[in-house]
């Protein structure tokens, strides 16, 4: 149990554990500290002091909690990020910065991941209980930090740069997760950067008063603007860490991969990166606009107004100043507790940061013409199946019996229904659950991946597509090659030999 439990406790994105068999000292090693001065870097804001991280092969220079923008507080809440503030003395960069405001409760996804590993029920419950009782990392609105790891501190060494944007449905996650602190990528001559960005209502809330207060007449998409600010900072400063500002690859998984596609769709990010990797995510599905609703769902601005009014935080006509005066805890608690706004705060087509829906920009050949690598996992839907069966604003009840489910299926898919039923084996009771989960994964990830890949290929641009099929090793596992299963392989941060 405890070998599998350790894997889960460490890999589930928040707990700090040292990988077995990798012998990495996450702090300044004794040998290095007695021989070497801590690594230094001169950036536009001042001088940074990092730490040496010892591996089996060499020393890596690590800089943590580096500000790439001013704290988004006060008048900068729900505003484009401002330039980072300078400092006069040498600044310590050995500790991670706070993660952005988000729920710290255990997600249904995480529970499904634990139970899908094939553990006996008592052991699975012990892992879930341990995860649920953990102390969450520090959290703050002041969270616009990035972390860098490099193998060569020679300025202008021109090492390739990879910039990681984490997943988490645009609602959770942090750049400081142990899973993303790779040493293998830097050992191969890559400058690795992981960056935070604002989440949930702090990152994607829209409101007419905020739009009116904005110089470009828009609101929402602050998380995308944070990512763009991080890329601008990298352009200005990465040479100090041995990186090449003309060879920057952006990559991410799930919402982080969607963020990559959003950056490809934003003219504000043009020239700030040169290649893109998307792992299980392309943001071609979201239909809501800043001022445009969809099939009875209101626009992003109306959703923002309703969020404040229905939770007693502000009136429908509140000013931008009144909204910015609301406490961050009150905003976060309302977003977590009011299920009417679950998943309501997402990137939107605002006509500026996102000129149109990502889907339309892909079809109109207006996404960035850079080389891309993208793909998805064989069992993307396995851990989301329970969510899929829950009632939503567009699906108020989910039939329990197979005949009723097939009738609903035929109603929704019309002429295509029989082909899909046969393709996924949905007419066989013993296969229905697995076929439906498989279809869910294709619908959520596969379709959007293939859409962008095909469109890119039609433009005769370099495109590479993969599918990840590695499954957990334990007999009895049901998660399969689940969502996010490839991440430890990308970063080589395995917590068990797999």
Language-model-detected regions and their locations in the chain:
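Non-catalytic accessory segments of hydrolases
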Residues: 18-221, 245, 403
């Amino acid at each position: 149990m405890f070998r599998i439990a350790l894997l889960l406790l460490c890999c589930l994105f928040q707990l700090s554990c040292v990988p077995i068999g990798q012998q990495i000292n996450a702090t300044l090693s004794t040998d290095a500290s007695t021989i070497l001065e801590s690594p230094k870097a001169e950036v536009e804001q001042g001088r940074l002091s990092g730490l040496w991280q010892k591996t089996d092969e060499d020393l890596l220079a690590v800089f943590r909690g580096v500000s790439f923008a001013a704290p988004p507080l006060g008048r900068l809440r729900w505003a484009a990020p401002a330039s980072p503030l300078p400092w006069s003395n040498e600044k310590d960069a050995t500790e991670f910065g706070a993660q952005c405001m988000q729920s710290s409760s255990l997600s249904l996804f995480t529970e499904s991941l634990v139970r899908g590993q094939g553990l006996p029920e008592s052991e699975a419950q012990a892992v879930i209980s341990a995860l649920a009782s953990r102390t969450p990392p520090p959290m703050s609105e002041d969270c616009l930090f990035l972390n860098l790891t490099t193998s060569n501190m020679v300025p202008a060494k021109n090492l390739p740069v990879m910039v990681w944007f984490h997943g988490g449905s645009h609602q959770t996650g942090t750049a400081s997760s142990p899973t993303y602190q790779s040493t293998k990528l830097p050992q191969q001559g890559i400058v690795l950067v992981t960056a935070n960005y604002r989440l949930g209502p702090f990152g994607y809330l829209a409101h007419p008063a905020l739009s009116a207060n904005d110089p470009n007449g828009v609101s929402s998409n602050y998380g995308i603007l944070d990512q763009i600010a991080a890329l601008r900072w990298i352009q200005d400063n990465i040479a100090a860490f041995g990186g090449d500002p003309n060879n920057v690859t952006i990559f991410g998984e799930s919402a982080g991969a969607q963020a990559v596609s959003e950056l490809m769709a934003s003219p504000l990010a043009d020239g700030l990166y040169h290649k893109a990797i998307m792992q299980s995510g392309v943001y071609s599905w979201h239909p809501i606009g800043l001022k445009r609703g969809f099939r009875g769902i209101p626009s992003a601005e109306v959703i923002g107004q309703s969020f404040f009014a229905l939770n007693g935080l502000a009136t429908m006509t509140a000013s931008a100043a009144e909204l910015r005066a609301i406490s961050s805890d009150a905003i976060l608690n309302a977003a977590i507790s009011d299920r009417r706004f679950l998943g309501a705060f997402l990137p939107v087509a605002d006509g500026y940061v996102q000129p149109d829906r990502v889907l339309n920009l892909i079809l109109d050949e207006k996404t960035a013409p850079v080389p891309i690598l993208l793909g998805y996992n064989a069992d993307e839907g396995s851990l989301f199946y329970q969510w899929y069966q829950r009632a939503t604003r567009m699906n108020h009840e989910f039939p329990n019996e197979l005949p009723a489910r097939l009738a609903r299926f035929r109603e929704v898919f019309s002429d295509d229904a029989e082909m899909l039923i046969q393709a996924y084996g949905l007419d066989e009771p013993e296969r229905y659950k697995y076929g439906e989960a498989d279809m869910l994964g294709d619908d959520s990830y596969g379709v959007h991946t293939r859409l962008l890949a095909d469109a890119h290929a039609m433009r005769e641009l370099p495109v590479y597509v993969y599918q990840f099929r590695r499954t957990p090793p334990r007999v009895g596992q049901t998660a399969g090659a689940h969502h996010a299963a490839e991440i430890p392989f990308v970063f080589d941060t395995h917590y068990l030999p797999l």
